[in-house]
Amino acid sequence: MTTATEKQTAKGRKILLTIVGIPIVIILLSTALYFMVDTKIVDLGTVNNGTLITPPLRFSELPLLGLDGQVQDYGKPEPKWSYVVFGGAECIDDCERMLYLTRQTHIALAKKMPRVQRLYVSTEGSVSDYLQGQMKQHYADSLVATVDNTALQKMFSTSGIDPLQKNSFFVVDHNGWLMMVYQADDLQQHSLNSLGKLVLKDMRRLLK
């Protein structure tokens, strides 16, 4: 009799825990979904043309340095969305084409252009004189910074993505979350044009 009562009591407790637990789980999932939609990591009812990085990476915590060696605060003077290209002291071939692509898609944002900035990040502690000249001549409104490669690789370690993979650039939201990557199939102009249109489609939606 006692055993049957104990079993019934245990069963009742499990049912009670289930009843109490389900709303908690729903609340937690709803909160997570709300955060992802609110920060535009997820846009319900739409499909991103870039590859979402989940969970997003805290780019704003990377120890970025300006070319003068001073700490560069990602969020200053004001928070903006960013196109980020990672490379070395030199940026040629596929790397330079990503600078070109991000510049063109940035310009094409028109009225929304001021809400986005472009950033080139060298993992080699500096950039060459040649690259500095190229940046001034062709990409004067792009920011340039350096970062320790070990710190960069550590940030990406859980994502399964190589930050230095060819033909690619990243999108960081205005809150400092690195949340999307685009990669061109090749460097042919028609391929870059096609990718640029997809980037614009995503960015115009994200910047609403």
Tell me what each language-model feature is.
Residues 14-35:
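Hydrophobic membrane-insertion alpha-helices, especially the h-region
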Residues 83-85, 118-121, 171:
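Structural beta-sheet core signal
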Residues 97-138:
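Structural microenvironment flanking redox-active thiols in thiol-disulfide oxidoreductases
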Residues 166-208:
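Thiol-/selenol-based redox modules, centered on thioredoxin-like
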Residues 1-11:
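N-terminal Lys/Arg-rich, disordered targeting/topogenic segments
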Residues 76-102:
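Short active-site neighborhood of thiol/selenol oxidoreductases, capturing the structured segment around
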Residues 25-28, 38-75:
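N-terminal "domain-start" segment that seeds a small globular fold
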Residues 119, 134-166:
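Short, internal strand/loop/helix patches
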